[in-house]
Amino acid sequence: MSNGKKIFISHSSKDQEYVDAFIQLLKKFGFRTQDIFYSSTIETGVQPGELIFDTIKRELTNQPVMLYFLSDHYYQSIPCLNEMGASWMLSDKHYPIALNNFSMKDMKGVISSERLAIAFNDKTSTNEINCLLKKLSHDTDVQAEPDFELNVEKNIQPFQNKLTQLIRQASYLKPDEKGYFETILSTHRPVYGTAKGVYDCFKLPSLIEPKSLGLDTLSEDESHWLFFFLTWGTFQEGEKVRFKLKKDKAYNNREFSDIGKCKNIYVSYLEKVE
């Protein structure tokens, strides 16, 4: 049984997918819907007919255990910062969680980097996650399900897999509203044979999102290479470029002994960005 203390999830709605995955892990551990306040779903958040700020005020007054999912999105949100300040005054249990690519040096306000509980990234270990769950269990008196304790690694693995998937998706190159991609050219690859003197080739630092290529998924071990006519100009590693994908054929699957599986990415427009 819970001691009445809820877990309060302070987050930006733009990071909801990360939080949704963690909520599923909390429930697998043994937390019930009524043990969690999470405003992004009706079952754990604001009920129909309620005012969100009145609900948040009531929940914070009950001195919940605070989890802050910190990101650039979080610090760009005035409601999130207000929530952080109010909870600091009303609660004595605070667990800041840094999401992927959020630097501790960017932590501001009343929650300092010295208080960081965990960073969710592709290196987060099972032991780190389980340690956080045990602290939350201690603070709320919510006990772990017997099945969870019998196989901690097996039960945490789906969350780690989802975290890795979300991090990978966040790194994808995505176009702007007009269909243009912007990136920095990475490794230059010499072109041989009949293509020499006609084409040039540079590795892209990130994969192009599957959706833009008309795909559902990408291979975990593939790389993407911009393969274009020399008539587009002379380019160097480290230069920032802007391009559009070729509509009739945006890519071609290739495989080489030195770089493995890859896609040649074809463009209909390419320019340097100063």
Curated annotation (Swiss-Prot):
Keywords linked to the UniProt accession: Hydrolase, NAD, Virulence
Binding-site residues, NAD(+): S12, S13, Q47
Cited Gene3D superfamilies: Toll/interleukin-1 receptor homology (TIR) domain
InterPro entries assigned: TIR_dom, Toll_tir_struct_dom_sf
One Pfam family matching this protein: TIR_2
UniProt GO molecular function: NAD+ nucleosidase activity; NAD+ nucleosidase activity, cyclic ADP-ribose generating; phosphatidylinositol-3,4,5-trisphosphate binding; phosphatidylinositol-3,4-bisphosphate binding; phosphatidylinositol-3,5-bisphosphate binding; phosphatidylinositol-3-phosphate binding; phosphatidylinositol-4,5-bisphosphate binding; phosphatidylinositol-4-phosphate binding
Domain TIR: 3-140
Oligomer and partners: Interacts with host MYD88.
Reactions this protein catalyses: NAD(+) + H2O = ADP-D-ribose + nicotinamide + H(+)
Function: Virulence factor that suppresses host Toll-like receptor (TLR)-mediated cytokine production upon infection. Acts as a NAD(+) hydrolase (NADase) by catalyzing cleavage of NAD(+) into ADP-D-ribose (ADPR) and nicotinamide.
The protein's name in its UniProt record: NAD(+) hydrolase TcpF
Free-text note on domains in this protein's UniProt record: The TIR domain mediates NAD(+) hydrolase (NADase) activity. Self-association of TIR domains is required for NADase activity.
GO BP: NAD catabolic process; negative regulation of MyD88-dependent toll-like receptor signaling pathway; signal transduction
EC number(s) per entry: 3.2.2.6
Record has NAD as a keyword: yes
UniProt-annotated catalytic positions: E83
